[in-house]
From Swiss-Prot:
It comes from Chloroflexus aurantiacus (strain ATCC 29364 / DSM 637 / Y-400-fl). One of its GO terms (molecular function) is structural constituent of ribosome. GO terms for biological process: translation. Belongs to the universal ribosomal protein uS8 family. Part of the 30S ribosomal subunit. Contacts proteins S5 and S12. GO terms for cellular component: ribonucleoprotein complex; ribosome. InterPro entries: Ribosomal_uS8, Ribosomal_uS8_sf. Keywords: Ribonucleoprotein, Ribosomal protein, RNA-binding, rRNA-binding. HAMAP family: Ribosomal_uS8_B. This is Small ribosomal subunit protein uS8. It comes from the Bacteria. One of the primary rRNA binding proteins, it binds directly to 16S rRNA central domain where it helps coordinate assembly of the platform of the 30S subunit. Pfam families: Ribosomal_S8 (PF00410).
Amino acid sequence: MSVNDPIGDMLTRIRNACMARHTTVSMPASNMKEAIARILKREGFIRDYAVIDDGKSHKTITITLKYLPDRRPAITGLRRVSKPGLRIYTKRTDIPRVRGGLGLCILSTPKGVLADHEAWRERVGGEVLCYVW
């Protein structure tokens, strides 16, 4: 099956798995998805992720979701911002704050995929991929 928006598909799979209280979610892997998963892990939104290579041409990324002690998901919401039909770019000075700084904005910059505070520190702007809170 062809997916027009792989990042949107990734976010939807994570959102659906959180709502269904699944412990893991798997999807086809790519470098961009791995970079997003790395940021989500570093920021504490997911427990872990692993890229599994089956030896053929297909790689799979498996994300282990994180839940709070009362069984609520650590990820309350995900929103795709820049879409294939409408790309959204921002300057360093205009990087949006998500939920008053409690959320996370993930950007694709010339220095790689970065969280909002990392892009600010690196003094770069870029494409706003998604918001996570």
